[in-house]
């Protein structure tokens, strides 16, 4: 491998679900998690005793809504006062507050304490889970990953995602665009002439459209557009609003302040939405939803389509935009490829088909796994795994989604790099001073498409000082914009006569974690991981004691042993088992050592009696239906004189 240590994976870090893959046996393997699912919910839950990630977190969300965090991708790299963040907060049961620099932070109760997390930390926990899923499958440590982001993510959102990878202990080989990777899943094995392919990627929280040209293993992105705040979650929100209004109308009760009821309703709405992709009608039945009232209702596909019609129509705007930007007509698009779970909605497919004059969208790739598939191929290439014939001639040419430039006199946006420029790229332009004898210039870097910088997004700024006194317009200042393969920008400025230089990597410190923050979060992630492991060991000890106690009781009550054990001995063990079970009921959160001590205590009483019983029975004829209880290593085999009975091995 070319300087990359350990295994490399591709991770699709989704708003609602995440997916991981590895390149093995000359193909992509999408890896199932411990529940057997190939996608894992991007959920993290905090309880009194443990942290849960993935399916386990999502499964308990109705019981613990305030401390179960999801949709972190909708917060990452955004400001607290961003209108999109404010709109989301209304629908989230967990608490989001403004932190330093107007960054959103998530507050939860964990092990009896109030804890605050950055969105990057929550995303890093999901990444750690995906890393563990991959490690369980591969059998070795996973150190490197290619992580995907929506093509329309801006600079700060990309940086924040990269930080999340670092906190998870991953070497992030590349941050890449989702639709481009999905195109690989579509085109990896396709041979033949040049094809124009439109990738329509509508997921749980984000929406992207990219237009690519694919020819003999070369994937060139021509244009990209999208909405980083549109997806299945928004359709769920409409359904939740509809049913809360219906509940209020029918029962004269407002359930909008009850987070548990809202969460149960949301889960039912998500299920109904999926049902409507294959049926004309879906039923909602929730027992004792609010104030003991059972809620039953129906929703038709037509009503759902009407309810979300504006969202569905909105998805066509970026399609028109990429066609304009790439200067192609509808008829020049050879294939429309669907990616993301929300593209299963029939209305979305119909709108697309109508837009392309009846052309049926391609459904040959799995919309949930396509992005992870492409990320895995990229990880294999970047980690030097290009001995594979399939990967040798593969070339990916991606683009920057937004125009980049700087502010010139009067607040005008002067663009150096146009949107949809292939990356990596480098552009330079010469500027000068605005006033006579001006000693320095302030270089302010913006991204966006508007003509005035006030309407665009400020990425960063720096000064170039020490310019010798000269009339306005005489000094020559060369400004260079350089975008790397991750889509992250470096800007430098040089004054030609003096050679004075200053530069900035747009790390977007306003929205970004400092190196110290990342270091601290890496250490905290390690601490949480070791706490999780310690908790698992504790639970194993508890389960071991519980199993031992119940097995012992089952053995005592076994018909085949009736009359072979003294009633007094039986009572001694039975009383002790009852004591232990009562103790367990009241000490669920005891330490591992306490469970082990109780097990030894029980073994100390039970083992001599059980040995005496088995010795008297001459071995253990016929095998006990209840099974020999685990003696925890304390039981000795029966004496040799009774060797005529079948041998019993100790159960580990």
From Swiss-Prot:
Stored Pfam families: HSP70
PROSITE patterns in the cross-refs: HSP70_1, HSP70_2, HSP70_3
> What is its induction?
Constitutively expressed, but whose rate of synthesis is augmented by nutritional stress such as nutrient starvation or excess of organic nitrogen.
Return the Gly residues bias intervals: 619-635
One Gene Ontology term of the molecular function aspect: ATP-dependent protein folding chaperone
Keywords of the record, alphabetical order, are:
ATP-binding, Chaperone, Nucleotide-binding
Region feature (Disordered) = 618-652
**The keyword ATP-binding is assigned to this record:** yes
Q: Which SUPFAM superfamilies match?
A: Actin-like ATPase domain, Heat shock protein 70kD (HSP70), C-terminal subdomain, Heat shock protein 70kD (HSP70), peptide-binding domain
Q: Which family does it belong to?
A: Belongs to the heat shock protein 70 family.
Tell me the protein's name: Heat shock 70 kDa protein
Natural source organism: Achlya klebsiana
């Amino acid at each position: 491998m070319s300087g990359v240590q350990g295994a490399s994976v591709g991770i699709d870090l989704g708003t609602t679900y995440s997916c991981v893959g590895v390149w093995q046996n000359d193909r992509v393997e999408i890896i199932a998690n411990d529940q057997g699912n190939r996608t894992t919910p991007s959920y993290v839950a905090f309880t009194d005793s443990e942290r849960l990630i993935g399916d386990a977190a999502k499964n308990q969300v109705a019981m613990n809504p305030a401390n179960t965090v999801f949709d972190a991708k909708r917060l990452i790299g955004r400001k607290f006062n961003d209108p999109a963040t404010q709109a989301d907060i209304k629908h989230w049961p967990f608490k989001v507050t403004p932190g330093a620099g107007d960054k959103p932070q998530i507050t939860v109760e964990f092990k009896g304490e109030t804890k605050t997390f950055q969105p990057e930390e929550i995303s890093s926990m999901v990444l750690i889970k995906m890393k563990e899923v991959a490690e369980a499958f591969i059998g070795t440590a996973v150190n490197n990953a290619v992580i995907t982001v929506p093509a329309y993510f801006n600079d700060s959102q990309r940086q924040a995602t990269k930080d999340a990878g670092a906190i998870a202990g991953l070497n992030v080989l590349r941050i890449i665009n989702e639709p481009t990777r999905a195109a690989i899943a579509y085109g990896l094995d396709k041979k033949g002439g040049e094809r124009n392919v439109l990738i329509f990627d509508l997921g749980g929280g984000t929406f992207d459209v990219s237009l690519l040209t694919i020819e003999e293993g070369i994937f060139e992105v021509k244009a990209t557009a999208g909405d980083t705040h549109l997806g299945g979650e928004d359709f769920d929100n409409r359904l939740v609003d509809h049913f809360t209004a219906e509940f209020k109308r029918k029962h004269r009760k407002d359930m909008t302040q009850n987070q548990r009821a809202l969460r149960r309703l949301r889960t039912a709405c998500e299920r109904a939405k999926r049902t409507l992709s294959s049926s004309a009608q879906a039923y909602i039945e929730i027992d004792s939803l609010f104030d003991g009232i059972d809620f039953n209702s129906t929703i038709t596909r037509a009503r759902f389509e009407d309810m979300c019609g504006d969202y569905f129509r909105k998805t066509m705007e970026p399609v028109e935009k990429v066609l304009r930007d790439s200067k192609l007509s509808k008829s020049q698009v050879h294939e429309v490829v669907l990616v993301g779970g929300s593209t299963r909605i029939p209305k979305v497919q119909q709108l697309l088909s109508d837009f392309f004059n009846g052309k049926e969208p391609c459904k040959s790739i799995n919309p949930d796994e396509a992005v992870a598939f492409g990320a895995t191929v990229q990880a294999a290439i970047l980690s030097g795994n290009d001995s594979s014939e399939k990967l040798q001639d593969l070339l990916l040419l991606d683009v920057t989604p937004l125009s980049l430039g700087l502010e010139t006199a009067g607040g005008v946006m002067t663009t150096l790099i146009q949107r949809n420029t292939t990356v990596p790229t480098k552009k330079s332009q010469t500027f000068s001073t605005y006033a006579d004898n001006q000693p320095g210039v302030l270089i302010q870097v913006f991204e966006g498409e508007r003509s005035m910088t006030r309407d665009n997004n400020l990425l960063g700024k720096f000064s170039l000082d020490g310019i010798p006194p000269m009339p306005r317009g005489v000094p020559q200042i060369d400004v260079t914009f350089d975008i790397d393969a991750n889509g992250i920008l470096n800007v430098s400025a040089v004054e030609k006569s003096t050679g004075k230089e200053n530069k900035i990597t747009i790390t977007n410190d306003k929205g970004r974690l400092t190196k110290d923050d990342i270091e601290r979060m890496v250490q905290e992630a390690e601490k949480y991981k070791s706490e999780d492991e310690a908790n698992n060991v504790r639970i194993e000890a508890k389960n071991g004691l519980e199993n031992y106690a119940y097995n012992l009781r089952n053995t005592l009550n076994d018909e085949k042993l009736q009359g072979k054990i003294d009633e007094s001995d039986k009572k001694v063990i039975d009383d002790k088992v009852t004591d232990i079970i009562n103790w367990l009921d009241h000490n669920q959160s005891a330490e591992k050592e306490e469970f082990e001590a109780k097990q030894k205590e029980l073994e100390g009483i039970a083992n001599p009696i059980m040995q005496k019983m088995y010795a008297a029975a001459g071995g253990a004829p016929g095998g006990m239906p209840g099974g020999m209880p685990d003696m925890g290593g304390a039981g000795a085999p029966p004496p040799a004189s009774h060797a005529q009975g079948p041998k019993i091995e100790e159960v580990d």
